[in-house]
From Swiss-Prot:
Keyword presence, Iron-sulfur: no
Name of one Pfam family that matches: ADI
Protein name: Arginine deiminase
E.C. number: 3.5.3.6
GO CC aspect terms: cytoplasm
Listed pathway(s): Amino-acid degradation; L-arginine degradation via ADI pathway; carbamoyl phosphate from L-arginine: step 1/2
Subcellular location: Cytoplasm
Keywords for this protein: Arginine metabolism, Cytoplasm, Hydrolase
InterPro entries, A to Z: Arg_deiminase
Family statement drawn from the similarity comment of this UniProt entry: Belongs to the arginine deiminase family.
Highest taxon above the source species: Bacteria
Source species: Streptococcus sanguinis (strain SK36)
The reaction(s) this protein catalyses: L-arginine + H2O = L-citrulline + NH4(+)
Gene Ontology molecular-function annotations: arginine deiminase activity
Amino acid sequence: MSTHPIRVFSEIGKLKKVMLHRPGKELENLQPDYLERLLFDDIPFLEDAQKEHDNFAQALRNEGVEVLYLEQLAAESLTSPEIREQFIEEYLEEANIRGRETKKAIRELLRGIKDNRELVEKTMAGVQKVELPEIPEEAKGLTDLVESDYPFAIDPMPNLYFTRDPFATIGNAVSLNHMYADTRNRETLYGKYIFKHHPVYGGKVDLVYNREEDTRIEGGDELVLSKDVLAVGISQRTDAASIEKLLVNIFKKNVGFKKVLAFEFANNRKFMHLDTVFTMVDYDKFTIHPEIEGDLRVYSVTYVDDKLKIVEEKGDLAEILAENLGVEKVHLIRCGGGNIVAAAREQWNDGSNTLTIAPGVVVVYDRNTVTNKILEEYGLRLIKIRGSELVRGRGGPRCMSMPFEREEI
């Protein structure tokens, strides 16, 4: 049996271990004037969002899945006073704090939090200016004097409950991502410390992408279709240059994959990642949002003579998938049943963003009734969860989960 702490060679193998993040006070630091800045469209009610998330976690446990939490793993990674101090300094450096006295006050605030879990959760929640002591006039620098009425000294990280994106598990390796927006790129700091210092994961997992890269990639665009084939999305959040870097590293490090299918589709927020429009639910079945099919282009990428070989695939997507996965026929299950109104509405509510926890066993939001009925007609067993508040962040069950271990298929 493999001793690697990360083992993810498919999208559908029985899920054994998964990482989540329970929404916290970062959601209470959302306000209407700054939603776009923080990549939100609405403000979830935290109490109900936590109840929904707890039900999601319990549904996974009921299926035999071990649930880990990002905040706990990050806290366990601060294994010495030196590493703790390094974490605080790196967090402050990336927080874009305006004003030297403000930065000094926040440093003291964080150092004063003795419990590691509480410290991590505070860094996630952000810091309001009203939490800090008033700076004496004589100590203020120019930045302090001309500072705006923006209420935060450090922005919250409200997207953290979408644990799929800051890093992605690929085989026995991890892609520690550089994200599309500054407000989310800070989230990858927790993954850095987990895979560098955690007692179980630290120093034991190869990185096939690093957060220090200057091009962007996010985990919602990284899908493990089989032990031989990956899929990546060229999307609003992931660019082609990042994909090339990722693939060269995967092939050079012999992570185990032979081919990558790169999906190029519309670049906009409603299709922000590949997994918002396309997920694998069984050996031969995928959900798909019909609106992407017309303009979709698929490229096959292999590694030959120490360089990437890229060929545009021709023909029907179902045929391309069947050929590359070695199955007789692939069924594309269209969100909303292909009805233009139902498809648009249910894709917006993440009807295509499913989490497969075993072949043909899928976690979905209960609200997407049209799509769910069709999935059941295809013989899938659905685990339906409520998501009235969680969905306000524009993510579904796959977005909210990062597999650490799946059984091989």
